[in-house]
Amino acid sequence: ENRMFKKKPTASEVDGVQYRRAKLWQIILCACNALLGLTVYSLIGMASYSASIGYGVATAAVGVILTATRIFDAVTDPLVAFLYDRVNTKFGKVRVLLVGGYVIEALALWLMFDVMSSKGFGVVTFTLLYMLYVVGMTINNMTVQTLPPLLSNDPQQRPTIGVWNTIFNYCVPMVFSIVLNVVLLPLCGGTYNQLFLSKAVHIVMIVGGIGTILTCIGISGFDKPESFESIGKREPLKFKDMLDVLQHNRPLQCYIASNASDKIAQQVASQSIIGTMLFGIIIGNMSLSTLLSVVAMLPSIIFAVFGAKYAGKHGSKKGIVTWSAVCMAVAIIMIVYFVAIDPTK
């Protein structure tokens, strides 16, 4: 009878290892980094509108510019990793990088969507501002990826961190999309214009700033030098070491190629101009875009839960390979469909 009420042993008790654990409020606050990352992601999806409306850049040229900046993004990633290894201040490492990344992102987006937009500047200004945004985005994204292992290395607590991140990852874009398209867009005349872009970037800066502050509060208890110390003597990271690993590590090369191609595809597919052509021209109903985005959240959450269980049962490798094949098959079907139909009818 007592066994029924016996407390479940912790991972530390089972493994004999003293794990680091976070409180629930710390996990939730750290998940608030999505308030910056995902609102910015939604805003930058309208970069094609900003380029066309504010800088007079042709739609086709915008696609080339945004895709080409992915190459610049690939250059900034190792540089930021090099920077991350060397930042160590009395205010911590992670908090400094989070605030620094936010400031750079906010400045670039503010200039791009508001201050310098529709002021007579052209393609060069837009490209430089977009590159500045990429720098801030890289700093922020790379730092955010280190938050979960900093919060907890307890295997029993990892699912809790993942659940809260998933909740924010789905809810933030949904709410932000409603705010932009249902609330803000009608107030600005019902069309994507300069007033709408300016108001949108102001909202992102405010919400992103709040998210950054909350994240810094949540991680403050773990943002200490001892959290980053490795066992034994710590050797400084050098560019030579990074190049050596890149040249001789075949799995890493495949991983980089896979992620780079995925990122390019995601960047192109997420541009607002794609949605405009699909819903505005082919389907003829732009409001349907927002409705479908909200409706799609439920199956997305279901698939996220199913995917986590599938990977846990069959392993991450099989999960990625199997569902990548499924996604490729679906993509081929969509391509054949859009080639076969006549969008004028």
Spans of model-derived segments:
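Short, Lys/Arg-enriched N-terminal segments with co-localized hydrophobic residues
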Residues: E1-R3
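Membrane-embedded alpha-helical bundles of multi-pass transporters/translocases
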Residues: F5-K345
